[in-house]
Amino acid sequence: MDFKYTEEKEMIKINNIMIHKYTVLYTSNCIMDIYSEEEKITCFSNRLVFLERGVNISVRIQKKILSERPYVAFRLNGDILRHLKNALMIIYGMSKVDTNDCRGMSRKIMTTEVNKTLLDELKNINSHDDSAFISSLIYLISKIENNEKIIESIYISSVSFFSDKVRNVIEKDLSRKWTLGIIADAFNVSEITIRKRLESENTNFNQILMQLRMSKAALLLLENSYQISQISNMIGISSASYFIRVFNKHYGVTPKQFFTYFKGG
């Protein structure tokens, strides 16, 4: 079911969002259409959305209150994700999940109602207290009916691939002028070997580099601490005007439009 779209200023459409970290998103102030693999999920306000790592999505977001941010996002780093996965495997008596199984969008992106009290506890935990965060997230998941798909998705998101190793190398210094040759040297193999291994995972060097640069740029914009020219240099693009064009082509919005919408005002 489609929701009613109102004024254009209340709405934004963003394309090509790569989920690099397993993400739990709470639609505190928006209604969101999520598009992936030619499917669409409509998520109404005050819902939880579980986004599997590695999923590429486009979203259309409509705010309820213009002066507030549209959602709250919890992005799980690798260590938190692994600890969460290990705990869930023990609690629910699961040994492993078939990572080669053909899985549709409904098993990679899941939405559910949320207990507001549990969510508030999660938001109020100190950002450096990983153990408390993991415990609260486990408890929240335990209160969700039919949570098997969520646990399966967390397990699969914790699996590391060769492309992840390439990302980790690049992420250490995004400002560097990366080439396939530099990556090959880092792994002490040929460029052809790098190319073939990435192709076996349905990706390539240029795609990984662009996704990392654009994802980092989006996060830096949300921090509201840097000028466009600074962000451009931080992600390895020397020209600010070129960065704006690339950002617009990738996401379908300019950096200014992106920042203005998500800053909450």
Curated annotation (Swiss-Prot):
GO terms for molecular function: DNA-binding transcription factor activity; sequence-specific DNA binding. Signal peptide: none annotated. The keyword Transcription regulation applies. Residues 164-261 form the HTH araC/xylS-type domain. Induction: Transcribed at 37 but not 20 degrees Celsius. Disruption phenotype: No longer transcribes cfaB; in a strain that also has an H-NS (hns) deletion cfaB is still transcribed. Keywords: Activator, DNA-binding, Plasmid, Transcription, Transcription regulation. Residues 181-202, 228-251 bind DNA. InterPro entries: Homeodomain-like_sf, HTH_AraC, HTH_AraC-typ_CS, Tscrpt_reg_AraC-type_HTH. Transcriptional activator of the CFA/I adhesin (cfaA and cfaB) genes of enterotoxigenic E.coli at 37 degrees Celsius. Also represses the silencing effect of H-NS (hns). Homodimer. This is HTH-type transcriptional activator CfaD. It comes from Escherichia coli.
